[in-house]
Structure formats: structure tokens, C-alpha cells
Amino acid sequence: MRILGIDPGLQTTGFGVIDVDGHRLAYVASGTIRTTGIALGDLPGRLKLLFDGISEVASRYQPDTSAVEIVFVNVNPQSTLLLGQARGAALTALVNAGLPVAEYTALQMKKAMTGHGRAAKSQIQEMVRRLLQLPGLPGTDAADALGLAITHAHAGAAMSKMAEVTQLQRRQHAVYKGGRVY
């Protein structure tokens, strides 16, 4: 399975693509989409650049699913609104590409990657480097995106296991209650 992770931002959006085969993780690609070349006041232009960039990444790497960071509420409401709009452009591009979208908070990703939710960016970079056996540290935005993809790979495996257990429990319950297996 191929997973595309997205760390949305209005100036810099990180992306990371990994392949998952059972418990094996393999690095495919990562990078950033920068909107700094567009004037700060041209919000629609920046959002279009993000949409087009994520659409291009999805088209090039053909992921099966995606994972996106959930926006946190910032002290500055204007910053939160702008980040939310960037996230909206990312979500729209992913859905437009026909991808399922899973959402994780930064805290969930950090906890999944390092064991605690208050990890520094450098710790995320190092764990991504180790888990994907990269020769060097990825940039912070790309590392966060790869971390989201890895988090989704682990969460997806856990969710599949839970679904199997739930199905087994339903079957046992059906046998016990009704005498039949459905």
C-alpha cells in the first residue's frame, strides 16, 4: 500500500510518500510545496498553488490513501483561519484525486513516532530517518508529512486487526445468541 502524508501550511506544505508491505516501510519520496513566490495578499493564488502541487504529487506517485495533519487552534485566530484554508486546499486536492483521507493531530503523530506527544521537530526528523533508513535528515515539513504517513501505516494495521477481532466477536456472538454463523 502506498501512503501520501501531507503537513499543510500556507507558506510551506510538506509531503511524504511511503510504501507499506506488512510491517516493512519503504521511502518513496518527500519534499515541500512552497508558496513564498506569490504575494502575501494573494491568498487565492497561494491556495491554487497548493491545490495544484498536491494534485501533481498524487498524480505522480499514485498513492492508495492519504494522511493529513489536523489544524490546531492557534493563539492568533487569523493564523488559524489561514492554516485552515491551506488545509482545505490540501483536502480538496486529495479528495479530487479519489484518495481516502485519514486525519491525525500533531500530538497523535508525535506520540506514534516518539512515544510522547511533545516531541521536538528534531526528534521527529531522527525517527523518520531511522524508520525509513534514510541517509540524512529530511526537512522539518517533509519529516512531519512522512511521520503522518508512518502513523497512518501503523494505525491502519491496528484498525485492520481491530476489524478482524470485531468480526470474530460478532461471529461468536451470533453463534452464542442465535445458534447460527452469519
Swiss-Prot record:
InterPro entries assigned to the protein according to its UniProt record, in alphabetical order: RNaseH-like_sf, RNaseH_sf, X-over_junc_endoDNase_Mg_BS, X-over_junc_endoDNase_RuvC
Binding site for Mg(2+) 1: 7, 141
Active-site residues (renumbered): 7, 69, 141
Reported cofactor(s): Mg(2+)
Biological processes annotated in GO: DNA recombination; DNA repair
CDD domains to which the protein is assigned, alphabetical: RuvC
Catalytic activity, EC: 3.1.21.10
Highest rank taxon of the organism: Bacteria
Top enzyme category: hydrolase
Keyword DNA damage in annotation: yes
Reaction it catalyzes: Endonucleolytic cleavage at a junction such as a reciprocal single-stranded crossover between two homologous DNA duplexes (Holliday junction)
UniProt GO molecular function: crossover junction DNA endonuclease activity; DNA binding; magnesium ion binding
Pfam families assigned: RuvC
UniProt: Mg(2+) 2 binding residues: 69
Keyword Cell wall biogenesis/degradation: no
Entry keywords, A to Z: Cytoplasm, DNA damage, DNA recombination, DNA repair, DNA-binding, Endonuclease, Hydrolase, Magnesium, Metal-binding, Nuclease
GO cellular component: cytoplasm; Holliday junction resolvase complex
Cell compartment(s), UniProt: Cytoplasm
Cofactor: how bound: Binds 2 Mg(2+) ion per subunit.
Function in brief: The RuvA-RuvB-RuvC complex processes Holliday junction (HJ) DNA during genetic recombination and DNA repair. Endonuclease that resolves HJ intermediates. Cleaves cruciform DNA by making single-stranded nicks across the HJ at symmetrical positions within the homologous arms, yielding a 5'-phosphate and a 3'-hydroxyl group; requires a central core of homology in the junction. The consensus cleavage sequence is 5'-(A/T)TT(C/G)-3'. Cleavage occurs on the 3'-side of the TT dinucleotide at the point of strand exchange.
Family: Belongs to the RuvC family.
Alphabetical list of HAMAP family matching this protein: RuvC (MF_00034)
Subunit organization: Homodimer which binds Holliday junction (HJ) DNA. The HJ becomes 2-fold symmetrical on binding to RuvC with unstacked arms; it has a different conformation from HJ DNA in complex with RuvA. In the full resolvosome a probable DNA-RuvA(4)-RuvB(12)-RuvC(2) complex forms which resolves the HJ.
PANTHER family registered for this protein in UniProt: CROSSOVER JUNCTION ENDODEOXYRIBONUCLEASE RUVC
Protein name according to UniProt: Crossover junction endodeoxyribonuclease RuvC
Species this protein is from: Delftia acidovorans (strain DSM 14801 / SPH-1)
